[in-house]
Amino acid sequence: MSKNVFTWERNFKDIILELVPEFKKCVGFKQNNPHHIYDVWKHTLHALEATDESYDSITKLAILFHDIKKPECYREDKDGIGHFYGHSYAGADYVNNLFRFMCLPDSITIPVCQLIRYHEIQFEDSDEFVYKWIDRIGDLQFRRLLDLKVADVAAQNPLYRSNKYKILESLINRQNRIREERDKLITIK
């Protein structure tokens, strides 16, 4: 999908907006936040563009829908900065209902909704954080969550990306090391 996402949008935008009318609210919806330079719809497309063949369909679906409820959850602070409190939970609930209406299997619905729900957690650069989230959602889902965040950050303001990328890269390295350590323990047994 990555490099062809804007061709896809030109050819199929009207279709996806009819299939999922909630996306209509995202088109042109300004985020009014220094961390964002695109409206919600364009941000989503740029996040999809940042994916490659290593991203599975679960992760790509989560990226497509991760900010679908931002317009509904939009609030401005006293300085006029836009915030989207609760959009990840509202989005997960919406997508759960949508996917159930579409009769998609739980093997798609549950992991996609889980990724959407947790994509706004505060990421901490520590082994404890990695262990906690692997225990909570599993190794594969945690890696998908990190991949979603990498794509999400790629679609944000370049001025703020560097530090976010450093944390995500460190978490990926930590997860890989922890996985190798666990694999060695399993092999020894």
Task: Go through each PLM region and give its residues.
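Terminal helices and disordered tails flanking the catalytic cores of nucleotide-processing hydrolases
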Residues: D127, N157-K189
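Exposed alpha-helical structural elements
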Residues: T7-N11, I15-E18, E22, S107, ...
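Divalent metal-dependent catalytic cores for phosphoryl transfer on phosphate-bearing substrates
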Residues: A50-L159
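Detector for Asparagine
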Residues: N4, N11, N32-N33, N96-N97, ...
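Acidic/His-rich, divalent-metal-binding segments that scaffold phosphate/diphosphate chemistry
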Residues: M1-D77, H83
